[in-house]
Design a protein with these regions (language model features):
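Conserved kinase catalytic-core helix
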Residues: 124-153, 157-158
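ATP-binding glycine-rich loop module of kinase domains
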Residues: 21-81
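Conserved structural core of kinase catalytic domains
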Residues: 70-128
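ATP-binding glycine-rich phosphate-binding loop
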Residues: 2-28
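Activation of the activation-loop gatekeeper triad in protein kinase-fold domains
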Residues: 187-192
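Active-site Asp-x-Gly
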Residues: 194-197
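Catalytic-loop of the protein kinase fold
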Residues: 146-163, 167-177
Length: 197
């Protein structure tokens, strides 16, 4: 799977966050999400002191729950990175300017989702049954995190993704819940909290 990191081709940009940019990429006729994030040279050594490595640590553990979280396929530290992070918010201007001087970035490849809940709720009117399914799926993801002693610490409408499905139900522990056309998952784990951190 590490070939994905080296041989994927960028199709288009699909998202911009405070510190990273998300692209749709293609490898071996399959689509993935690639997150590129600039880091300082003192963040290049893996350590859960830094948010980027916390995100990778969290994603690796939660990859066994691909319906509730994004599966990470690979990650790669890049030297001489030419990525330019767009300014997402004036609040982050100083940090982005500081990072723009760095020559390092991290590239992570995740499974791709169809979109984020913010856009889904803006473009479609979800029924009460769809909202019930959304809440049940989100609570189950929170339960899984609690079971592994994690807190997401950054849940909002841009960090909840969805995937359209023809499956009628999704298994949440011992029960099956109707999907009503969508499977929801948490994304963006850079602020994850764990006792190990």
């Amino acid at each position: 799977m590490t070939d994905i990191c080296n041989k994927c081709h960028i199709i288009k940009q699909i998202g911009v966050g405070a510190f990273g940019t998300i692209y749709m990429v293609k490898y071996d006729d399959k689509y993935y999400a690639m997150k590129i994030q600039k880091i300082h040279n003192w963040q290049t050594k893996p350590s859960t002191e830094h948010n980027i490595w916390r995100e990778i640590y969290f994603a690796k553990i939660m990859s066994k729950y691909p319906e509730q979280f994004s599966k990470i396929y690979c990650y790669q530290l890049i030297n001489n990175c030419s990525h330019v992070q767009p300014l997402y918010s004036k609040y982050h201007r100083k940090r982005i300017q500081s990072l723009s001087k760095s020559k390092y970035c991290i590239k992570m490849i995740f499974d791709i989702k169809d979109g984020i809940i913010k856009d889904l709720m803006k473009n479609e009117h979800l029924t009460d049954k769809q909202l019930y399914s959304f809440v049940a799926q989100l609570l189950y993801a929170l339960y899984i995190m609690k079971k592994h002693n994690f807190t997401h610490a950054d849940i909002h409408n841009r960090n909840i993704a969805y995937k359209k499905t023809n499956n009628k139900t999704i298994k949440l522990g011992d029960i099956s819940v109707n999907t009503y056309g969508y499977i929801y998952s948490l994304i963006d784990y850079g602020n994850a909290i764990h006792p190990k951190f």
